[in-house]
């Protein structure tokens, strides 16, 4: 578990205990990186974390092979991340159909207006906006806020990355976001329960 920016976080905390702490503090779902090369995750990590907390689990992966969907199902995932920028419009719709056929809810991650164009012609359950530019790693919450009016009306709107304070959450709620994918500020804090209370209590 980790990121290209932070490197591996292995040994800094126990992922299963962390997942259990999230659940005890009221988290609605668990996002688990399963991509091994850049984010140091695994499907085994997802299985262990879900068993420890019982929350619905989102597998975070760069999906390019149908076997990845099958591995996610076998690991116990309930949803899968689809990074819109990796696909054409038809490819994205196809991956979403393949995920749904396996019982996985697709969370489509967008970052800019060109990604939103890929969503046209399909109904989406969940659409996220990543506040982090994966090319520069810079974070700007104003990015999500500007994108929010263009998200599909029926989709659960998820703000992703850069959420560190209650003021951030309130700002994004006011913009119309329904859910929040919080990563680093929880992973790097000393007490996840206290941090979740600070953000959402």
Predicted regions span which residues?
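Glycine/Thr-rich beta-alpha phosphate-binding loop at enzyme active sites
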Residues: 4-10, 18-38, 119-148
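Glycine-enriched alpha-helix->loop->beta-strand junction motifs that scaffold or abut catalytic
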Residues: 26-27, 52-55, 74-80, 100-104, ...
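Glycine- and Gly-Pro-enriched alpha-helical subdomains that act as flexible
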Residues: 34, 44-48, 52-68, 74, ...
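Catalytic cores of alpha/beta
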Residues: 64-76, 111-123, 159, 163-182, ...
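Glycine-rich phosphate-binding active-site loops on the catalytic face of alpha/beta enzymes
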Residues: 71-91, 128-137, 177-196
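C-terminal helical cap(s) of enzyme catalytic domains, especially alpha/beta-barrels
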Residues: 146-150, 173, 186-201
